[in-house]
């Protein structure tokens, strides 16, 4: 809803007190960087795929963004480097590499609003730990919305909303920092403890 891919049937979504229905979708999206679980990559070079974040960016800026997203070394290891051609939907790259390319795009776009929708879901625990520092840097100074099932991705968020999808239409059942929702929400505590136990 924040990106206006669809509008709410009831109520409204506002940013800075402005109802998003009154904002041209294209203008709104120019202010948002989105890193999704399944990034949209296209046939073309790796350089051009990252440059989607900022079409005017120099090659050096693209490479800097790739370094911040921890994908530069993977690209550099390819025979054609940044000129390596990708197939449809990024064929030839792993899921984690595709996600890190999307993170590089977000660094390059430098938008005031950042949406991370399961942005590290395709990374193993070791790779995710390495990228968390980069994501923390990316989140600085901007409004960030994290959608995640992995608690390591959200534990340090300043505000966590816990949704219970078993309630009609899904409902927010807890709101606060990690410590606050852990103390007050049985659902959050149960899920957090289960995930912590399974990862140890």
Q: What does each of the following model-derived ranges do?
A:
Residues 183-200:
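C-terminal boundary and immediately downstream tail of ABC-type ATPase nucleotide-binding domains
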Residues 4-7, 14, 70, 191, ...:
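Glycine-centered secondary-structure boundary/capping sites
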Residues 1-5, 26-41, 46-51, 56, ...:
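ABC-family ATPase nucleotide-binding domain "signature/switch" substructure
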Residues 9-12, 169:
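Conserved coupling/switch loops of ABC nucleotide-binding domains, chiefly the family-specific signature
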Residues 75:
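Nucleotide-activated donor-binding/catalytic signature segment of Leloir-type glycosyltransferases, i.e.
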Residues 11-18, 28:
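Conserved ABC transporter NBD signature motif
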């Amino acid at each position: 809803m924040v990106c206006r891919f669809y509008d709410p049937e009831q109520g409204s979504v506002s940013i800075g007190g402005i109802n998003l229905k009154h904002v041209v979708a294209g203008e709104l999206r120019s202010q948002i960087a989105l890193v999704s679980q399944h990034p949209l990559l296209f046939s073309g070079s790796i350089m051009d795929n990252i440059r989607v974040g900022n079409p005017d960016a120099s090659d050096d800026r693209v490479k800097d963004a790739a370094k911040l997203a921890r994908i530069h070394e993977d690209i550099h290891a390819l025979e054609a480097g940044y000129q390596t051609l990708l197939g449809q939907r990024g064929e030839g790259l792993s899921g984690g590499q595709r996600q890190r390319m999307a993170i590089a795009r977000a660094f390059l776009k430098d938008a005031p609003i950042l949406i991370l929708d399961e942005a590290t879901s395709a990374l193993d625990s070791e790779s995710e730990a390495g990228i968390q520092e980069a994501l923390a840097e990316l989140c600085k100074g901007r409004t960030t919305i994290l959608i995640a099932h992995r608690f390591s991705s959200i534990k340090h968020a300043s505000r966590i909303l816990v949704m219970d999808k078993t309630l009609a239409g899904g409902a927010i059942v807890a709101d606060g920092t990690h410590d606050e929702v852990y103390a007050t929400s049985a659902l959050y505590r149960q899920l957090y403890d289960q995930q912590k136990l399974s990862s140890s």
